[in-house]
Swiss-Prot record:
GO terms for molecular function: copper ion binding. HAMAP family: CutC. This is PF03932 family protein CutC. Keywords: Cytoplasm. It comes from Xylella fastidiosa (strain 9a5c). Belongs to the CutC family. InterPro entries: CutC-like (IPR005627), CutC-like_dom_sf (IPR036822). PANTHER family: COPPER HOMEOSTASIS PROTEIN CUTC, COPPER HOMEOSTASIS PROTEIN CUTC HOMOLOG. It is found in: Cytoplasm. Its main location: cytoplasm.
């Protein structure tokens, strides 16, 4: 199905109401790459899960099977990353079709929101593509992801995100970690002035989350809170590193620690 057909299909749809105000107390969103990680996030007290696949490469859209099982078992809000491939955030018409189909799956399964982002070749928000994706999402909440960090002008991107009606934007302040980008994040929080939630992410941990809160003024934080899980050694082939190796999973104790710190540091 072509991009134009999608425009015709969804142009008349209503997004529904979305809340964009800052919460008074601080909360934690956990990026989860598996069913086990999502359940650990919930057990640890996270306020929301962002479900994705391939966290090591910035995250991709999870499989339908993973999404269906997590939706059935999770009782806290579930947002789903919609990203069909790694690399940049300039998407083709075919990739747009894939993203629309993935968003429709989220709607059918009763997810609470989606995490989106699309840029044009000039590094500006692709407003046309974003409007179509948001229309397909209907009443689901929308987070604009870290495409803002590679956009031409983060301040202008923030205004576009607000104009689109997104609930929040995830950002590292254009740096490798949120701590390195804290000054830029603080500027975005001030610019947003409560019109959208600015959520720091990338390298957020128990060792820096309170510093980030003080330096940025943010009230929502995004972390994976992962630990390495040792793989079972099932055969005499230890040198095949791409098969059967160790893997990461959300650590419930790390989630609890982050949640506890944010609760203690609440203003």
């Amino acid at each position: 199905m072509s991009f134009d057909v999608y425009v015709i299909r969804v142009f008349g749809k209503s997004r529904g109401s979305r809340e964009a105000g800052m919460s008074v107390s601080a909360g934690l969103e956990v990026a989860a790459g598996s069913v086990a990680s999502a359940l650990a996030a919930q057990e640890g007290g996270a306020m929301r899960v962002e479900l994705c696949h391939g966290l090591g490469g910035g995250g991709l859209t999870p499989s339908y099977g993973m999404l269906a099982v997590v939706r059935e078992r999770l009782h806290i809000p579930l947002y789903v990353l919609i990203r069909p491939r790694g690399g940049d955030f300039v998407f083709s018409e075919e990739e747009m079709e894939v993203m629309c189909c993935d968003v429709e799956c989220c709607v059918r399964l009763g997810c609470d929101g989606v995490v989106l982002g699309a840029l044009d070749p000039a590094g500006e928000v692709d407003m046309g593509m974003m409007r179509v994706l948001i229309a397909v999402a209907g009443s689901l909440g929308v987070t604009f992801h870290r495409a803002i960090d590679v956009s031409a002008d983060p301040g202008r991107t923030l205004e576009d995100v607000i104009a689109l009606g997104c609930e929040r934007v995830l950002t590292s302040g254009g740096r490798s970690s949120a701590l390195e980008g804290a000054e830029t994040i603080a500027a975005l929080v001030a610019q947003a002035a409560g019109r959208v939630v600015v959520m720091p992410g990338a390298g957020v941990s128990a060792g820096n989350v309170l510093e980030l809160r003080v330096r940025t003024g943010a009230h929502e934080f995004h972390a994976s809170a992962r630990s390495v899980v040792a793989a079972r050694r099932l055969g005499p082939h230890p040198d095949i590193h791409d098969l059967g190796g160790d893997y990461d999973c959300t650590d419930v104790d790390k989630v609890r620690q982050l949640v506890r710190l944010l609760s203690q540091g609440a203003s």
